[in-house]
Amino acid sequence: MPPVRNRGGRFSRGRGKGPRGQTNRRNGFTTSRVEDVEPEDHSDNESHLSHEPAGDEMDHETQMDDVSSDSDDDEAQQTARPYNELIQLLQVNAEPKGPARKRRKVEHNGGEKRDAVPAANGEEDDAVLLGDDDLQEQEPSDEEEEDHPKEADGKYESDDEEDANDPFETHFSAVDESELALKIKSAEEKKWKNTKKEIGSGLKLVRAIPDIGEGDVSLLPAMKHFSIVKLKKKLYGPATERIPAISGDAQHIAPYIFGYQDVLYGARTTSNSSAMRDILAVHAVNHILKTRDRVLKNNSRIAKEQDADLDLRDQGFTRPKVLYLLPTRQACVRAVESITRFFQPEQQENKKRFLDSFSAADDKSWENKPEDFRELFGGNDDDMFRLGLKFTRKTMKYFSQFYNSDIILASPLGLRTIMDQADAKKRDHDFLSSVELVIVDHADALLMQNWDHVGYILDHLNLQPKEAHGCDFSRVRTWYLDNHARFVRQMIVSASFITPEINSLFSTHMQNFAGKIKVTPVYAGAISEVPLPVSVKQTFSRFDSLTPTKDPDARFKHFTTTVLSSLVRNITSSRDKSSAGGTLIFIPSYLDFVRVRNYFATSSQTTNVSFGAISEYSEVREMTRARTHFMNGRHSVLLYTERLHHFRRYQIRGVKRIVMYGVPENPLFWGEIVGFLGLDPAGVVDAAEGGVRALFSRWDALKLERIVGTKRVGNMLREKGGDTFTFV
């Protein structure tokens, strides 16, 4: 099982490859207290476990955004270097290291090409699958040499005419340098002008542009088809055939995507994820093809006009232009499938190796798991991977070395392991120096892995390289040389919901001079969608917390003095021990879980309370035993973490009342956890009377909105007359 977010070793993982629920970590602390009681008639108790597979117009909006404002100070300060100093620095390291051996390619049926270099011992080990040679540079293949215009006697003709109104041109090439400088200065000083609007489809849009004292901020009109998008002709046919009309949320976001503005989309669902993935693939491939087309045109022009003094700036320091950050290998497969669907290469090199190592069949035992769980963990759910894609005129190559790649797809863990190696001499992030489009898909899933890896990668984007890597500095765009690439780069982040960590990307890493937009849904509230046949009392208790750093202590004090004292009194004073049990305590944070677990084990207040505690670190047998004891009444209380529920989606039986130490980040979890009250049909009425009690503070504003609804959350955060709110 994965370690907690931002905890563990140097490269702590999310959910890794291998047996689900297995871990070598054992808690050396008392994690439960068992009470011997007379068993009731639970003839099917064990069967329930053994057959289950292991596995901002609103008034409060400003307050919500302030939750992540402290992270602004963490932004990496980057110092621009003078042009001459940069040239001298890089030329020192420009000594050739000798070309790698050119690989002979063998044609296979189906138009696929595969490397003819055999793997050691006849099989690929983990190092090969991860691509330990990702940073090695190779000579171009025969096909690439033929495709290069220099070898074509300077003859190169494009199938597209240049358009001065093309966002690709206006954003990267035809930029007024004085205006760009003003916008960059405003972005550096965090001076943004914004507008907020709620549109009829149930979305809240916040658009911001650098404040240079000109004009007002307005929203762009919806984009309903590709006819107004400046696409390469090669893409237009497949795009319009696959997506004849842009609908839903995508029509409101597409203008900003194709306009090269930063996008934070917080309404990702299993139903709209495929459409969004296709639109992003069209945009990514369009950017790659236009970048390549511009370079080839200028190469041809230089070959024809060798005596002319041409100043053609069309490149970055290195080749990779698009970076995908994805949670699992199967998510990578889906992204690549979208890319190939629109690029339609005549040949795909190493495709079989890619499918063999990245794709897998879904687990059939998960048919009863929630849809979002099956989407995230279906197929190959390994979170340790990286992949380079290289595009030529007719071919797409998988597993290309990063410095020869156009698109890099990776998990945060997989990419960081190659960037931040133990040997300082092997550390390298120059391949990220010229990334112009970053796509972070399913950011909430990455949050449940190790968010520190995401921050590390983003902090190392668009830094000036330490080596030249064969760069022609006379062709490098001036804003690269001025160390301003991060203000031109486009970042697109999609998430099922927005947390303070994800929200901080909007304020810290989204600095696009063209502007940025944040899209969030208007929430009806998870409390209105509880899957129970009877109404259940849902009580929310607010406690005072001065700062986010003091919030854990304030929460713990409120829980032990107010909630737990009442809970212990009810358990110990009840004559019927079986009815006294059944209390599930749901704890979002693992650190809070450890603190509460230790308190239950050592405090005199809970001496007479039998309890169990299971988290994402618990072994399967520990979890099974604790759930069985809880269901049989031997545990009166069960402590249960949000990350364990994220990775397992257990159905906990025997629940008669629920205490939420904090509301869950994922609003779907509210209905699933409260639904535990109805798993025993005979006791559902009694369980509904036990109800749910949840603790919250002002720093829970973002996730509280998802639980109680957009219309209710403002009053609950500001209410002066009381701190308890009950919904039935």
From Swiss-Prot:
Ranges in a coiled coil: none
InterPro entries, per the entry: P-loop_NTPase, UTP25, UTP25_C, UTP25_NTPase-like
Localization, UniProt: Nucleus, Nucleolus
Compositionally biased region (Acidic residues): 67-76, 122-146
Molecular function, one GO term: rRNA binding
Bias kind Basic and acidic residues: ranges: 33-54, 107-116, 147-157
Gene Ontology BP annotations: maturation of SSU-rRNA from tricistronic rRNA transcript (SSU-rRNA, 5.8S rRNA, LSU-rRNA)
Compositionally skewed regions (Polar residues) per UniProt: 22-32
Listed Basic residues bias regions: 7-18
Gene Ontology CC: one annotated term: nucleolus
Top-level lineage group: Eukaryota
Region span, Disordered: 1-172
UniProt keyword annotations, A-Z: Nucleus, Ribonucleoprotein, Ribosome biogenesis, rRNA processing
PANTHER family from the UniProt entry: ORF PROTEIN-RELATED, U3 SMALL NUCLEOLAR RNA-ASSOCIATED PROTEIN 25 HOMOLOG
Function, as annotated: DEAD-box RNA helicase-like protein required for pre-18S rRNA processing, specifically at sites A0, A1, and A2.
Quaternary structure, from the entry: Component of the ribosomal small subunit (SSU) processome composed of at least 40 protein subunits and snoRNA U3.
Family: Belongs to the UTP25 family.
Protein name: U3 small nucleolar RNA-associated protein 25
Species, as recorded: Neosartorya fischeri (strain ATCC 1020 / DSM 3700 / CBS 544.65 / FGSC A1164 / JCM 1740 / NRRL 181 / WB 181) (Aspergillus fischerianus)
Gene label: utp25
